[in-house]
C-alpha cells in the first residue's frame, strides 16, 4: 500500500463543540480519553485524530468493528495484523499517517526555546543552530523538533527515545537523519502556522485533506 498522510482541519469540530456528535464513532478507550480532557479544544483534537484513523483504516478495507488496538511496550497503539499508523495534532489540525511499514508523523505549533534545544538536542544540532541568524533559529528549532518526534514515533518508542541520541540535518532542501543506512526519510510540510514532518521508508506523499460531516 502507498503511504497516506491525512489532514483534518478541526475548526468544524470546535464549533459549538460538534466533536461530541462524533464521539460514539470512536472506540471506547479513545472515548474515555476524550472525555477526560479538561479543555474543549483538546477533546476536539483527540476526536479528530480518532476519526481520521477510523476513516483511513476503513479505506484500507478494515471495518470499524475490526479496529481493535493493542499497545507496544512503550504504550504506542497498533492494530495487530493491520497497517502501521501514526497520529498527531496541534493548533487547528489533526494528522494521520498510514503505511505498510513503520511510520511516524508529528505536527507542531509550539515555540521551542533555545534552552529546550540545548537540553534535549544532539550537540551537533545545537552547534548548527548557533550558526544561524537569530531570526531563523526559532523555525529551525521547530523543524528539528518535529523531525525528531517523527523519527521516535517511527521507531515506536516516542519520547522514550532520547532526542540527543541521534542527529537531524537541516538544509534548504529539507531534513535528513544522520544514520549509517539511507532510510528512513524525513518529509517536511507547512500546514497553516504549523510545521509537519513525516518519517517513512517511502517517497513523499501528498497531503490529503479530509472533511468530517
Predicted regions and their residues:
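Core catalytic alpha/beta fold that binds nucleotide/phospho-ligands
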Residues: 1-213
Amino acid at each position: 500500500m502507498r503511504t497516506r498522510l491525512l489532514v483534518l482541519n478541526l475548526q468544524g469540530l470546535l464549533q459549538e463543540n460538534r466533536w461530541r456528535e462524533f464521539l460514539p464513532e470512536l472506540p471506547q478507550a479513545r472515548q474515555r480519553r476524550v472525555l477526560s480532557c479538561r479543555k474543549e479544544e483538546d477533546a476536539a483534537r483527540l476526536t479528530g485524530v480518532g476519526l481520521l484513523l477510523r476513516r483511513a483504516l476503513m479505506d484500507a478495507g478494515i471495518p470499524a468493528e475490526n479496529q481493535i488496538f493493542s499497545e507496544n511496550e512503550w504504550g504506542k497503539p497498533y492494530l495487530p495484523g493491520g497497517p502501521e499508523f501514526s497520529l498527531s495534532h496541534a493548533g487547528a489540525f489533526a494528522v494521520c499517517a498510514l503505511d505498510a511499514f513503520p511510520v511516524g508523523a508529528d505536527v507542531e505549533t509550539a515555540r521551542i526555546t533555545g534552552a529546550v534545544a540545548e537540553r534535549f538536542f544532539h550537540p551537533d544540532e545545537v552547534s548548527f543552530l548557533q550558526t544561524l541568524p537569530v531570526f531563523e533559529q526559532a523555525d529551525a528549532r521547530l523543524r528539528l523538533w518535529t523531525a525528531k518526534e517523527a523519527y521516535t514515533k517511527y521507531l515506536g518508542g516516542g519520547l522514550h527515545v532520547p532526542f540527543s541520541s541521534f542527529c537531524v540535518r537541516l538544509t534548504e532542501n529539507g531534513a535528513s537523519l544522520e544514520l549509517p543506512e539511507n532510510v528512513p526519510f524525513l518529509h517536511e510540510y507547512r500546514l497553516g502556522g504549523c510545521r509537519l514532518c513525516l518519517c517513512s521508508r517511502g517517497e513523499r506523499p501528498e497531503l490529503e485533506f479530509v472533511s468530517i460531516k
